[in-house]
Amino acid sequence: MSILPVIFLSIFFYSSFVQTFNAPECIDKGQYFASFMELENEPVILPCPQINTLSSGYNILDILWEKRGADNDRIIPIDNGSNMLILNPTQSDSGIYICITTNETYCDMMSLNLTIVSVSESNIDLISYPQIVNERSTGEMVCPNINAFIASNVNADIIWSGHRRLRNKRLKQRTPGIITIEDVRKNDAGYYTCVLEYIYGGKTYNVTRIVKLEVRDKIIPSTMQLPDGIVTSIGSNLTIACRVSLRPPTTDADVFWISNGMYYEEDDGDGNGRISVANKIYMTDKRRVITSRLNINPVKEEDATTFTCMAFTIPSISKTVTVSIT
């Protein structure tokens, strides 16, 4: 045996030993907080979740995908590995998928849970995306979870179906994937289907999403009663009442007062007890009423200013009273 092959073998084994010895230990970052439930026989794209959490100085040399306990021949890395694609998934493709990012000195991994389900009435609540609008408002319904499919084709054609209300002129698709609903009605609620075409390898695949639209009661704006101005005198005991009326579905509000950059809340005096707030809550005529009383005792010259009653709710409201001293 010549000495040359021995030298090459020695170099090969030494190089392999050094690479193995220097390979960084891979940090397991656990499972991604969101699970993915996708339809059978339709393309699935999963993101590598830890990429967006890596520091800007981290130089990724390699992104690897694997399925725990199975072969990886169904996985197609796309977008330079930052996403993985399965073109025609079956229920056997359900499981845990792992994204591994590495460079010369660092390695980490994170897993995602994928469940593939069939389209059936019994599964519709599992695979639908809930969205909420309010009655008598202008709302929007969005074709969900499609960004990865339209990243290279923002003008992708998206077709809506599945609900008779789509023929109503109040429902208009102004932007691909977004339906604007004018003057929302209760019977707009239900299931809507949006389908987009995804092209890969010269072939076209349908990507289907089902939206479960819920229509909640009309939000009736809260009302506030507060006088525009009050006249008082130095040394007197002054109480200013602010009355906030709420209608369902709005049932609660945080009511407080503001004056000259100072906040006054219930059980929170100005330090010497001269200015205090007391709130009382009661029900009347299907309304929840909060009466907030600002008490100033005794009145001083510095109180000749404005006091704003603020109700922090949806939407928030406020009103200002001017105190004058004679």
Curated annotation (Swiss-Prot):
Subcellular location: Secreted
Domain of life: Viruses
GO cellular component, as recorded: extracellular region
Entry keyword set: Disulfide bond, Glycoprotein, Host-virus interaction, Immunoglobulin domain, Repeat, Secreted, Signal, Viral immunoevasion
Pfam family, one: ig
Signal peptide: 1-18
SMART domains: IG, IGc2
Domain Ig-like: 24-115, 122-212, 221-322
Sugar attachment sites: N80, N103, N113, N206, N237
Biological process annotations from GO: symbiont-mediated perturbation of host process
MF terms in GO: interleukin-1 binding; interleukin-1 receptor activity
Paired cysteines (S-S): C48-C99, C143-C194, C242-C309
InterPro entries for the chain: Ig-like_dom, Ig-like_dom_sf, Ig-like_fold, Ig_sub, Ig_sub2, IL-1-bd, IL-1_rcpt_fam, IL-1_rcpt_I/II-typ
Role according to the record: May reduce the host inflammatory response by interacting with inteleukin-1 beta (Il1b) and thus decreasing the association between IL1B and its cellular receptor.
Quaternary structure annotation from Swiss-Prot or TrEMBL: Interacts with mouse Il1b.
Family membership: Belongs to the interleukin-1 receptor family.
Name of the protein in question: Interleukin-1-binding protein
Organism: Vaccinia virus (strain Western Reserve) (VACV)
